[in-house]
Amino acid sequence: MEFPETNNNPIITLSFLLCMLSLAYASETCDFPAIFNFGDSNSDTGGKAAAFYPLNPPYGETFFHRSTGRYSDGRLIIDFIAESFNLPYLSPYLSSLGSNFKHGADFATAGSTIKLPTTIIPAHGGFSPFYLDVQYSQFRQFIPRSQFIRETGGIFAELVPEEYYFEKALYTFDIGQNDLTEGFLNLTVEEVNATVPDLVNSFSANVKKIYDLGARTFWIHNTGPIGCLSFILTYFPWAEKDSAGCAKAYNEVAQHFNHKLKEIVAQLRKDLPLATFVHVDIYSVKYSLFSEPEKHGFEFPLITCCGYGGKYNFSVTAPCGDTVTADDGTKIVVGSCACPSVRVNWDGAHYTEAANEYFFDQISTGAFSDPPVPLNMACHKTESLRTLASV
């Protein structure tokens, strides 16, 4: 009786076993014990409000029922990310009252940039002094200070991360929009485009420094369609519009930034092979609500929900939550629209909770990620798994 031939090549057998083990490992979801976030108002859970001045109602009205310092009527994408891992909402690093840093910290502040801005708060139209270099410095101090508190003991020891959390944590980034905004207010579109390589190189340098402090899993958002925001449409009413009504040239700059950011993230993967980098195309997800709002259950995407006056219900002199005087002398509180749950634009520059939840639902699947890995598997090195699976 003849038996079928078997391939006893040890190299092929070992490759097969490694492939199976790796694929099994990849099916496990990540158990991030903490999240450390860096960015601007898209992910600021109250940092700017703690450092400078609070936001007035109706900010926060939908979910928190009070103003928390978030630039929305409710939760941000970073809040939904925390919820998805059963982690508490991130306390702002700058908040000295009631903060709990056990499961991470938020270093983002509204108005933050990658590079040092030319005009800083409290100057009129100023940007945050807590640009990315400063956020990195804050994180660098946070690590030893938090561990000193843990070692000292007492009631505060349980409010800071354990040492191993820093390597196992998820590191999220959403920054760059304000660098482009500052450029648009002071430079030509062509000149802003020319600043992009320096911006992404500066971003990369900070990511590498954060890596040197122990970070290993990076979740990086590109920037959104800034030309669809009503503050840009109001500032530059003469700009050519696309089919969605967005300012084409300004979105093209955002796309140029995103292209260069994706390139620099690819280079980071090569330079730091022990880390995992997921690049998230938040631009495409956000633009879908401007180009096809009804398809996704939204309406009037270009019109500000909490605003006053003008074609887009937005005026820089009548911001959300402010009190303004009408032409007839009547005092008017700039309040929310009737149904924020079906609106996209909250205050002219930021998004509603409903939009933020939609964005999270889309990006968490991995459909807009490079590599295409779901958020809950972002700790796995999918490039290695692909290589093994193809053996």
Curated annotation (Swiss-Prot):
Residues annotated as signal peptide: 1-26
InterPro entries named in the record: GDSL, SGNH_hydro_sf, SGNH_plant_lipase-like
Keywords: Allergen, Glycoprotein, Hydrolase, Plant defense, Signal
Record PTM: The N-terminus is blocked. Glycosylated.
Residues in coiled coil: none
Superkingdom of origin: Eukaryota
Example GO biological process: defense response
Keyword check for NAD: no
EC number: 3.1.1.-
Annotated glycan sites: N186, N193, N313
GO molecular function, one term: IgE binding
Annotated active site: S41, D347, H350
The keyword Oxidoreductase appears for this protein: no
Alphabetical list of PANTHER family matching this protein: ESTERASE-LIKE ISOFORM X1 (PTHR22835:SF292), ZINC FINGER FYVE DOMAIN CONTAINING PROTEIN (PTHR22835)
Family: Belongs to the 'GDSL' lipolytic enzyme family.
Protein task: Has lipase and esterase activities. May be involved in plant defense.
UniProt protein name: Esterase
Phylogenetic classification of the source organism: Eukaryota, Viridiplantae, Streptophyta, Embryophyta, Tracheophyta
